[in-house]
Amino acid sequence: MKTYSRFFLLIFLFLFFISCNQKPNPVVLSSKDLFAQKCALCHVAPTVDVLPKHLWTKFFPELGAKMGVLESGYNPLKGMNVNEIDAVIESEYYTRNQIVTNEQWTQLKEYIIQNAPDKIDNYQRSEHQFNNLDAFKPKKINLDNNPGTFITLLSFQNDVLYYADLFGGFYTYDFKSNQSSEYKRFENAIVWYQQLKNGDEIFTEIGKLDPTEQRLGKLWIQKENQEIELIASELHRPVHTLSQDLNKDGSIEHTISEFGHLTGSISQITSNGTSDLLWPNPGAIQTQMHDVNKDGLMDLVSLVAQGDEAIVSFIQQKNGDFKPEYLMRYPPNYGSSWFEMKDFDGDGDLDLITANGDNADLTYTQKPYHGMRISLNDGDGNFEEAFFYQ
């Protein structure tokens, strides 16, 4: 009974604060300037024409809640349990301080409806044609023949294919016999796997695959001839772990991309067992290790793909701390899903190759700006798009 009382109290307090908060001082802005200003508070501002009118309208209630305006009949906390509501309120993902007046909110919606297209009709396939991969031949392999199998990981390491399913199974596949064998079993799905040079194995267990504010993820290490050991628990939907000796002290640091949902982070578990927060926002998909500024210290580069979509570098300082810097930022509709950092043009500088195409959100439609991009480094850490394939 106490749990239910607390649940309804939290809902009441949230709705009270978001609807009865202090109103912002009104500033007279043109509709275009108002859109550009308010839609750039949390991320790169999109343009109105990136979505059709009906999808903007569908997104208004959520957008309003983010700005502190609660539209009639909309509860952004619907479907969450008590712990999730606690986490969202504490994070202030939905601001308690209204950042637009009711009049400005109406002005924003009218501007979007007047200027958004009825449909996005400029979707065209790229004209660039690629040569056939004549050096390769496809070979079908049998991984998901069992009813209800959902593959959550494919990892090819040391001539062995490892894969995992939604139900916590972790398997190896033998190419010669075309047979799979169960390697380990976990409570929930494994979504990332890494073998270290010393033979240790790192397993990233997501917890709950569907969007949630519950922190159910875990990080495991399997050392040779030892029982599997839990490194960390209560992780927020972790999807990737980079396990490397970043400061060259002989010990491994684990950099964890906690994608999360409304909240999330990039965290790092150091060799002494402490956990450091590198990035306080959701959407981290993966982290790589590079010497970005060529100072001899290994830095981190991460892809963040939720809200404030960006590629962020974490420059290692001499004291071992990491300083975040944006390398690239994208509007929140770009659907960033992967990146690689390579010297693509052979000039000695690391360039960026990004894939944009995640479309599983409230604004599902074919989007002409989804595709593969190559952004070249000018040598000073500035990146400019040089190639786009749709």
Listing of model-derived features with the role each one plays in the protein:
Residues N21-L29, Q37-Q390:
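Beta-propeller-forming repeat regions
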Residues M1-S30:
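Bacterial Sec-dependent N-terminal signal peptides
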